[in-house]
Amino acid sequence: MPNLLVLVRHGQSEWNKKNLFTGWRDPGLTEQGMEEAREAGQAIKAKGLVFDVAYTSALSRAQETNRIVLEELGQGDIEIIENEALNERDYGDLSGLNKDDAREKWGEEQVHIWRRSYDIPPPGGESLKMTAERVLPYFEKEILPRVLKGERVLIAAHGNSLRSLVMQLDKLSQEQVLALNIATGAPIVYELDDKGGVVRKEMLIEREAH
């Protein structure tokens, strides 16, 4: 089996459902989110994939997704590493606000710039560029070497931390990554060559991204 890396964004959280900016706040999964995580695990299992190690963030929605996926695979006892380097982008002063309320407070154009520019952070928060600057060094130092040793790796994380990884793996430009949305609970399977280049990529579930 070529070097295997599977990415999965956490299932729908309570705050996704309420249309709130979440960031580093820590709501749990909804019933739908748990079901999305189960479906992710079942889709991975149907492909006959298993893992040697799983990485996740310091936030419970990703940890819960990771746990459910591994349970579906009968792999709840493998090594699990939690690290805040994989956390969601910190939305700063937007965290906990309804997206419509934020638009009312700061204006639709300004909120759109914060959400969809690469390097402009919201007040007290992170841009996508800043998120990538903590995600990618951790990936390259801690995770990629294990993949290249032949270990099969799962990463259960967040929309923006995973966008940072996909940007690097798929060699996307800043403009391309801004158009990229990663659906909840939809595994992305990568096979990498011995230098970390992508040999093959497969989306296991087609789900609309929010």
From Swiss-Prot:
Q: Where is this site: Transition state stabilizer?
A: H158
**Record: active site:** H10 (tele-phosphohistidine intermediate), E88 (proton donor/acceptor)
Matching SUPFAM superfamilies: Phosphoglycerate mutase-like (SSF53254)
Q: Which InterPro entries match?
A: His_Pase_superF_clade-1, His_PPase_superfam, PG/BPGM_mutase_AS, Phosphogly_mut1
UniProt keyword Cytoplasm, yes or no: no
Which catalysed reactions does the entry list for this protein?
A: (2R)-2-phosphoglycerate = (2R)-3-phosphoglycerate
Per the record, the pathway is: Carbohydrate degradation; glycolysis; pyruvate from D-glyceraldehyde 3-phosphate: step 3/5
User: An example of a Gene Ontology BP annotation on this entry?
Assistant: glycolytic process
Which residues take part in binding substrate? 9-16, 22-23, 61, 88-91, 99, 115-116, 159-160
Q: Which family does it belong to?
A: Belongs to the phosphoglycerate mutase family. BPG-dependent PGAM subfamily.
Function summary: Catalyzes the interconversion of 2-phosphoglycerate and 3-phosphoglycerate.
Name recorded for this polypeptide: 2,3-bisphosphoglycerate-dependent phosphoglycerate mutase
What's the source species for this entry? Parvibaculum lavamentivorans (strain DS-1 / DSM 13023 / NCIMB 13966)
Q: Which gene encodes it?
A: gpmA
